[in-house]
Amino acid sequence: MLKAVIFDLDGTLYDYDAAHAVAWEALSAFVESRLGIAPERFAALHAEADGTLRRRCGGGSAIHNRLLRYQVLLEAAGKPIALAPAMAEVYWTTLLDNAIPLPGAMDALARLRAAGLRVGIGTNMTADWQFAKLERLGLTPLIDFMVTSEEAGAEKPEARLFELCAEKAGCAPGECAFVGDSLKGDALGARDAGMRAVWLCRKSGATQAPEGVAVIRSLNELPKSLSPL
């Protein structure tokens, strides 16, 4: 019997790619105006800083810290690190301003809660910005619990994050469904952790559903995919 449904956040409950694209454009323009670094060069520096941070931290939640990433970038570029907080502010403010719930998101959450199920978030990110996103999206009142990779000390598709989701839901993994847009990180990770896996694949074209994974094209299809509850 299904008792809880857990959702990935970025790319599942809102269009992360679209919001990120606008935020990245704003950040690139800011960096060019303040530091004279062209967008192409900034993109290369950003990729290098991301790689450096991942090597230094060995994974973990620090890789999601944009303030830290911009600090590393500025240090490598020989620029004042004092600009890092402003860079982070530009990025996050723009992303939040452009974050809009995907069609069916609010209705799906509300219907699940009305059916007596617990609703949670399972995300590879830090708690501070995920709470900010949920608040901006107007979804906070519909969420019972959240597990971030920061809290779990593990990133999807590692089992630990899914196990902690089930623990917070107060039920066994087999009594949980996990919904996400990443086949490997969300769907296969959840399936391998013993949960019902639902892959939100919004791309057009035929999709071969892996064994043990349900596929939906929109969150409007979720209630049917989960029935019978």
Regions found by a protein language model. Name each.
Residues 1-5, 18, 40, 84, ...:
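Asp-based, Mg2+/Mn2+-dependent phosphohydrolase catalytic module
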Residues 2-103:
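N-terminal helical cap/lid subdomain that shapes the substrate entry/recognition surface
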